[in-house]
Amino acid sequence: MNNLKNKKILVTGGAGFIGSHLVKRLVEYKARVSVVVKYNSIIDCPRLVKIWDKINIIEADLRNTDSVREMNNLRFDYIFHLAAYNHVGDSFKHIYENVNSNLLSTINLLNHGPKIKKFIHMGTSEIYGIQKKIPFDVKEKPNPMSPYGVTKYASELISILKSKQTKLDLLCLRPFNTFGPYQSEKAIIPEIILKCLQNKEIKTTEGKQTREFNYIDNIIDGLLFINNKIKHSIDPINIGSNKPIPIKNLVRKIHSYSRSSSKLKIGYLKYRPNEIWKMQANNKFIVSKGWKPKISFDLGLKITINWYQDFYKTYLNKNSLFKKL
């Protein structure tokens, strides 16, 4: 990705799971990277510790118009907009936070933020919701089933509208479920891994619902690949493997790979309301451009389990910064 060398890039959500991996990759490619973080939050972020001296930190609250206006005199080649409230289940309890973090932040950035040449909007597969046609195609009408999905879709639409009005170069990306090192334990894969490593009882639904899970390096590869290939598109682009797995099989794989003695109680829990039974990416477009995942699901899962084995005692420490991921 030599095209990124010396490019001035702003990453929102750069202290988050996907964002921090993106920032590290951009630094590796010798881009001039700035990261927006909430006030006084960077000191508590273990994800960026190793590259603090190689990035520029901008403290701002993207939900606050006046705060964003303070960046108006800055100029960047790209904004990678990843900042979001991104917990699907909890989004039902925190609707206003979803609106503020997922929608208002986008509106503020596009209307009051830095001068930019290109805006890369990081969406989500949750925009699709329940669909009749599998795998999910960007041509199908979105049907989000959570406040998270609704607000991320609205954010995408606002970005498209702004692009049409101002001729701003835009990419709207829809990555499917992602996993890897440094992910919050609120996500299903690290949650199950940590329970397996402690040999705790694991209670799940029947696990018939299917999801595809993409190793983080593959998603970052896809994001940067498509940004390099396509200057502008108001049509969203899926990033995913097109290889779904039933949740019950996922749990059993983690249990096996971690050599856990945890008791599995599959079928113990009820399905959540508005359960999405199948999520699978139609990835024909990005594959047709020459991208494909480099790391298989099973290898990525083993790498991730090994990482959590190294750090799980840190996760268990109530005072650990990892608890804030």
Q: Predicted segment positions?
A:
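Structural element of the ATP-grasp superfamily
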Residues: 109, 159, 192, 285-287
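Short beta-loop-alpha junction of Rossmann-like oxidoreductase domains
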Residues: 130-132, 181-183, 187, 285
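C-terminal substrate-binding subdomain of Rossmann-fold SDR/epimerase-dehydratase oxidoreductases
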Residues: 28, 196-325
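N-terminal Rossmann-like NAD(P)+-binding domain of SDR-like oxidoreductases, especially those catalyzing
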Residues: 1-178, 310-311, 325
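Hydrophobic alpha-helix immediately C-terminal to the catalytic Tyr-X-X-X-Lys motif of short-chain
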Residues: 154, 158, 162, 192, ...
